């Protein structure tokens, strides 16, 4: 072994030292970034957008290294799609920064307030969270989204991306730091953490006192590991095992179009439809029409073969228990027949990740029952699951879709990246 070769323990020690050093540097600049004015923040975001486009060739070259390594290591094409960057996607990422620049700055917003009987003026205002850690998988666009939303909301970003996107993320952060430096702001406003081992994730999520919040974004394994292992507060952006229930009183052509859109528009994202639930009261021909339309769109059907063959379906892959709670992220979908809206609700309650659940029906009472009783961050009534998206909501870019119930639920946009502070201004009052 060469004298310059590091042992596994030395690599871990170096990673731990680097994570804690970067977290400390981030914590030290929190007071300055928290009070940065809206004008400077917007100027930085717009300059960063321009710089990303201007240096797109550098980004694409770095990204090509990641894609080459991914394919060499047998990465699935759905994951390659998440990883890939081209000029069009870089323009889209830059557009996201410009959009964030145009959004209302949440910092300092007065949520409520009044004058107390003794004359003290009190108000509750939005303030940044502080040091915001992000742990995410092979989606380099998250690097820029996290920076933009963190900066606009007055937060400092610590980013722990995937080793599969290390070249892309390194180049993106380098460009963002160059822009910050041009505006005489610390490069530590956004930092990329090492990703040689999984231990660096543990270093980040246990850096209590240095890191104020950690937001995991990725598959179920990653999210569970972060949430269960963290001593730092976390915001869970859950996986998307999204269901689409087609009621007997749905407009069938409309329902088919929505379920195909939810499945095929972009199958590798968390708002993709993963399970179609068919009302048993639908005619056999209507059930078959749904399945065949999905197959014609290139989607593989998983289900109880006997159940689906009973209404004429063919080429069905026998489903196991895993299929019902899977986030496929591919051109696969699970299909089941259920006993009306209550059957759909029961199935969803058992397998849902509480992300997005949808219903197609023309019956107002059925739609209301579904919306009232389903437990999810978003409920779609006669709309595709693909609409669960911060930009579609008019909120701009998002960190992720929170599926938990505390602090925030749904798209994590600017207001969701703040906390609050109570400010009381008196004239010398003392409490009796």
Swiss-Prot record:
Catalytic activity as recorded in UniProt: L-glutamate 5-semialdehyde + phosphate + NADP(+) = L-glutamyl 5-phosphate + NADPH + H(+)
UniProt GO cellular component terms: cytoplasm
Any one Gene Ontology BP term: L-proline biosynthetic process
Enzyme class: oxidoreductase
Pathway(s) the chain acts in: Amino-acid biosynthesis; L-proline biosynthesis; L-glutamate 5-semialdehyde from L-glutamate: step 2/2
GO molecular function: glutamate-5-semialdehyde dehydrogenase activity; NADP binding
PROSITE patterns from the UniProt entry: PROA
Known function: Catalyzes the NADPH-dependent reduction of L-glutamate 5-phosphate into L-glutamate 5-semialdehyde and phosphate. The product spontaneously undergoes cyclization to form 1-pyrroline-5-carboxylate.
PANTHER family registered for this protein in UniProt: DELTA-1-PYRROLINE-5-CARBOXYLATE SYNTHASE, GLUTAMATE SEMIALDEHYDE DEHYDROGENASE
Name by which UniProt lists this protein: Gamma-glutamyl phosphate reductase
Native organism: Corynebacterium glutamicum (strain ATCC 13032 / DSM 20300 / JCM 1318 / BCRC 11384 / CCUG 27702 / LMG 3730 / NBRC 12168 / NCIMB 10025 / NRRL B-2784 / 534)
